[in-house]
């Protein structure tokens, strides 16, 4: 578990929030998305995954931090992993699902009980493959405690800053396999347009293509604040 990767642990002096009156359209899209019940069609605002991508300096982390903090203030539970190439733990993609599972266990007691049972029976999951981590640490506990869950936002920011592009692609491919089962969780992903990431979202054979909304920030720079 990497507590330093959660948005609450980030130094607010180093993360600039969106100023009032800026990014109004983008934040409005995110608010509409979080307030809609999960669906699975990218043509509607209720897809369970929202992918914000763009070139360097377009404000992806600023938006992710601002929206996560806004949801927290609204009483929506937020679990987050802010990747950073400058910190070893925050650039290790193998720690993303373990950290998210830990945060979910702290937020939802029934999930925590089930997760503890899983870890007692298999204490080596922290070193398991990423797909197996997702299934055992998040999906299976979620299946058995679904009725006790409510809306929760999961933020994975700057996914492209993970040090292993191959594992980054595996993370998204694994998520694609289970995306129809994550309700009432909603997942916000931000990244640059790296091939290892865009290929998974664009794949017609996976489920992320049809279960995600997308926003390309650098295409909005001239016309949208």
State where each predicted segment sits.
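Conserved NB-ARC/NACHT P-loop NTPase core of NLR-like innate immune receptors
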Residues: 1-225
């Amino acid at each position: 578990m990497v507590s330093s990767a959660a948005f609450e642990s980030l130094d607010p002096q180093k993360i600039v929030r969106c100023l009032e009156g800026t990014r109004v359209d983008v934040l409005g899209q995110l608010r509409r998305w979080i307030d809609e019940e999960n669906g699975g069609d990218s043509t509607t605002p209720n897809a369970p995954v929202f992918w914000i991508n763009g070139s360097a300096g377009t404000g992806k982390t600023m938006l992710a931090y601002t929206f996560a903090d806004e949801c927290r203030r609204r009483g929506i539970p937020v679990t987050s992993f802010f990747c950073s190439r400058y910190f070893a733990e925050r650039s290790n993609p193998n720690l993303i699902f373990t950290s998210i599972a830990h945060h979910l266990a702290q937020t939802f007691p029934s999930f925590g009980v089930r997760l503890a049972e899983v870890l007692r029976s298999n204490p080596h999951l922290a070193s398991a493959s990423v797909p197996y981590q997702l299934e055992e640490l998040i999906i299976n506990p979620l299946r058995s405690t679904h009725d006790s869950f409510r809306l929760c936002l999961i933020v994975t920011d700057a996914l492209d800053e993970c040090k292993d592009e191959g594992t980054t692609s595996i993370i998204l491919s694994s998520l694609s396999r289970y995306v129809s089962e994550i309700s009432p969780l909603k997942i916000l992903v931000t990244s640059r347009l790296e091939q290892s990431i865009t290929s998974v979202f664009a794949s017609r054979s996976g489920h992320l293509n049809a279960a995600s909304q997308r926003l390309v920030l650098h295409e909005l720079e001239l016309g949208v604040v």
